Amino acid sequence: MTFATDWHRPPRQMNGTSFFYAHTSQWRHEKVGVDEILAPDADGNMSKLSMIDYNAKAERMGWLPSAPQLGENPLDIADQAAAAGIDAAQYVAGRLKDGSLDMACNDPDNPKNFPRNLFVWRSNLLGSSGKGHEYFLKYLLGTQNAVLSDENDEECIKPSEITIRPAAEGKLDLLTVLDFRMSTTCLYGDIVLPTATWYEKDDLNTSDMHPFIHPLSESIQPLWQIKTDWEIYKGFAKKFSELAKDYIGVRKDVVLTPLMHDSPQELGQPFDLKDWKHGECDPIPGKTMPAITVVERDYGAIYEKFTSVGPLLEKVNNNGKGMAWDTKHEVEFLRKLNGVQASGVGKGQPKIETAIDACEMILTLAPETNGHVAKKAWEALGKATGRDHTHLINSSEHTAIRFRDIVAQPRKIVTSPIWSGVESEEVCYNAGYTNVHELIPWRTITGRQQFYQDHKWMRDFGEHLCVYKPAVDFKTTQKLLGKYPNGNKEITLNFLTPHQKWGIHSKDCDIFVS
């Protein structure tokens, strides 16, 4: 549902830390040299790189995702490969090797490579969620900010693996925010779309901190011009499809995917770490660099796909954590429950017209809320372990939670192989329970509880074992003491801010006081 893998695979995803570190140009202000945090016995060449250099290397070697991925439009690259009669993966690898194409992470401030539009949903990115608030304001928004350090300071570490351009300020052309609170991000947004709050919409709610699934249910209709999250995004999809049908149409897209956990790819670089960028090896998709897949996209049909269940759940399967199971029966059930689309690319497929339809799709397909699906998922895991695990859900095999059920009363979920605890009247939920008692391998490369990380970079940075490390001096406060006096004595405080359960997030902001 979230990544539309019922219609297209693989999805294009990104980790927020790498994305915002690069595009808010925080790397320009780094004053801590890598040599200051390396282990004494580290490879001497490691100290020649900066923090952003390591991130760029990790992205191009396939350890991290990238956004954007390549220095050219991936739709155009797909066309070029087709015109040349070459497989897209081979075409991209060849151009990366001869230098005519580069990864976007190697040139983050190229106007072709930095973000222009940002849609923020229910996240206070510019308040407390994004770390480095002042850098977001300066480099993404180009507005008043409190950046106190000078990016041209001679103490700032200069990268050697990426292209350094004059700093771009105000990279974003459009910031759109969906929220029911007037958050800090809303205050800075170009467009704020007021969305329905707790009692104005239908939705699902759960947590990894308790074993129940419960609803948000519409008690009153959204007020004034407010719409629910589902209706807002459905509206986006509809208008975009109307415009894209003529402007973009049907195109093929080259998608890069990192070497994924719970897949054979994570064993693809077992010994020395070789960087194809430096000619240490060839760029081999899925082994020494990200995997490459061509995905056909019909941009004029996005709305029709948004409002219907895609065919891949029947043609391929549903999956998670390296397991896969058949879902034909569940999709057929959704046809009867939600009805079917009468026309378009989703003709004959189950409808997802309303938020409740979407909730029913999730409840029907998830092993946590459908006992029959849970049994198939446990059987799939059993094929890998050689053991029968289905006894874990004998008492709940026929459980099938519907949205109306949780509206009446929150329901306890079914034991699922996606997690490592069990839902039981005799055993409290405890992470790792099935690994110990069902002899299921731990999700590590060795299949065992693993405290030693045998990776060259981890060893070089002294992070191969979890041991005490003193605090790192980031060299950010000393030069500022006395620079902006306010008549009061200045002190520097170092706060420990663990994230307590059931707590608010305000403490993630305003933690440095002077």
List the predicted regions and their residue ranges.
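A glycine-rich phosphate-binding loop feature that marks nucleotide/adenosyl-phosphate handling sites
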Residues: 1, 249-264
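A cross-kingdom feature strongest in bacterial/archaeal respiratory oxidoreductases
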Residues: 1-225, 269-514
